[in-house]
C-alpha cells in the first residue's frame, strides 16, 4: 500500500467512524460493543481471533461473517494496539488427543516444546502437532497470545454450539491449561484477560457464551465479564424461514450500530487481499 492509498484509507475510516457515532441505537448489542471497545482501549496489546468462515461465490459481492465484522470494527476502533488473526485462513490441524493416552497425559510436556526460536521465542509453545506436522500454524497464535494483555475470540453459533474452527482452536490450546493443572507448572495466561463474542440465528447463543466463559476460567484466563456476549437474530428456535435469514444481516447492523459503509469498506479490503 502506497502513501496515497494509506491516506485515503484513513480518510474513509474517519468518515465511517464518524457516521457510526451518529444516531446510535439503544440496544443491548450496541451497548455491549461499546463497552467491549472501552475495556480494550485500556490495554497495551489486544489479540482478536476471528473463527467464522464464509465462502465467496461472487468477488463483487463479498460476504463477511457477522462475528468477523464485530472483530474488524473493534480492530479499527483500537488501532495499533490490535493484532487481528483470521483463524479460518490458517492451517490449524486437529488435536492429536495426547491428553488422554492409555499411558497417561502427555499433552504439553517438555518433550513437545517447539524448538524453532523464531516460532517459539518464549519457549512456552509445547504442542506435539507442531513437531509431528511442521506445516501447522498454531505457533503463530501462541506467539501473539503470550505477548498480549487481552484476547477475544469471535465465532458463529452452529447447531447450538460454538463452530468447528473455534472448537478446534480451543482443543489445540489444551497444552496451556494442561501445563498448570496436570503438570503442576506455572499458569502462563493468568494475567491475560479473555473474552468471547458470538453471533447466531435462532438458538442457544447465551448458553454458548456461558459455556465458553466457564471453559476460559478452566483454562486459567483472567475473565473480563465485559468481553463476553452474543448477538442472536431471534429467540424463536423454530424460526427457520428464508425471510428471517434474509432479514438477519440488516438487523445485525441495526442492533450493533455498525454502518453499511463500514461493511462495504471491509468488503473492498477483503477483495484486495
Q: Which stretches of residues belong to each language-model region?
A:
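A generic structural signal for short coil/turn motifs at secondary-structure boundaries
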Residues: 55-59, 203, 236
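Short Gly/Pro-enriched loop/turn and capping motifs at secondary-structure junctions
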Residues: 98, 201-203, 233
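Ligand-binding pocket scaffold of soluble enzyme catalytic domains
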Residues: 36-39, 48-50, 195-197, 225-237
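Charge-dense, intrinsically disordered terminal/linker segments
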Residues: 1-33
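Extracellular serine-dependent O-acyl
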Residues: 84-90, 223-231
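Generic alpha-helical structural context detector
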Residues: 12-15, 171, 214
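N-terminal beta1-alpha1-beta2 submodule of the flavodoxin-like/Rossmannoid cofactor-binding fold
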Residues: 20-155, 159-178, 242-273
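Short, glycine-/small-residue-rich phosphate/pyrophosphate-handling segment
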Residues: 163-165, 182-228
Amino acid at each position: 500500500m502506497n502513501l496515497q492509498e494509506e491516506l485515503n484509507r484513513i480518510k474513509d475510516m474517519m468518515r465511517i467512524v464518524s457516521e457510526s457515532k451518529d444516531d446510535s441505537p439503544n440496544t443491548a448489542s450496541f451497548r455491549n460493543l461499546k463497552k467491549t471497545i472501552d475495556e480494550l482501549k485500556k490495554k497495551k496489546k489486544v489479540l482478536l481471533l476471528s473463527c467464522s468462515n464464509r465462502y465467496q461465490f461472487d468477488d463483487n459481492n463479498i460476504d463477511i461473517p457477522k462475528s468477523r465484522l464485530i472483530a474488524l470494527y473493534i480492530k479499527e476502533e483500537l488501532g495499533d494496539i490490535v493484532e487481528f488473526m483470521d483463524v479460518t485462513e490458517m492451517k490449524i490441524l486437529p488435536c492429536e488427543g495426547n491428553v488422554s493416552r492409555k499411558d497417561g497425559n502427555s499433552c504439553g510436556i517438555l518433550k513437545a516444546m517447539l524448538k524453532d526460536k523464531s516460532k517459539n521465542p518464549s519457549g512456552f509453545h509445547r504442542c506435539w502437532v507442531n513437531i509431528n506436522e511442521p506445516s501447522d500454524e498454531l505457533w503463530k497464535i501462541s506467539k501473539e497470545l503470550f505477548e498480549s494483555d487481552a484476547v477475544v475470540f469471535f465465532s458463529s453459533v452452529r447447531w447450538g454450539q460454538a463452530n468447528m474452527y473455534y472448537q478446534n482452536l480451543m482443543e489445540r490450546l489444551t497444552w496451556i491449561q494442561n501445563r498448570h493443572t496436570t503438570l503442576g507448572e506455572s499458569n502462563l495466561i493468568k494475567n491475560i484477560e479473555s473474552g468471547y463474542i458470538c453471533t447466531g440465528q435462532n438458538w442457544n447463543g447465551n448458553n454458548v457464551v456461558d459455556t465458553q466463559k466457564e471453559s476460559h476460567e478452566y483454562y486459567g484466563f483472567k475473565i473480563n465479564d465485559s468481553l463476553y456476549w452474543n448477538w442472536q437474530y431471534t429467540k424463536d428456535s423454530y424460526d427457520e424461514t428464508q425471510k428471517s435469514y434474509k432479514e438477519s444481516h440488516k438487523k445485525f447492523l441495526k442492533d450493533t450500530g455498525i454502518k453499511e459503509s463500514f461493511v462495504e469498506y471491509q468488503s473492498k479490503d477483503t477483495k484486495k487481499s
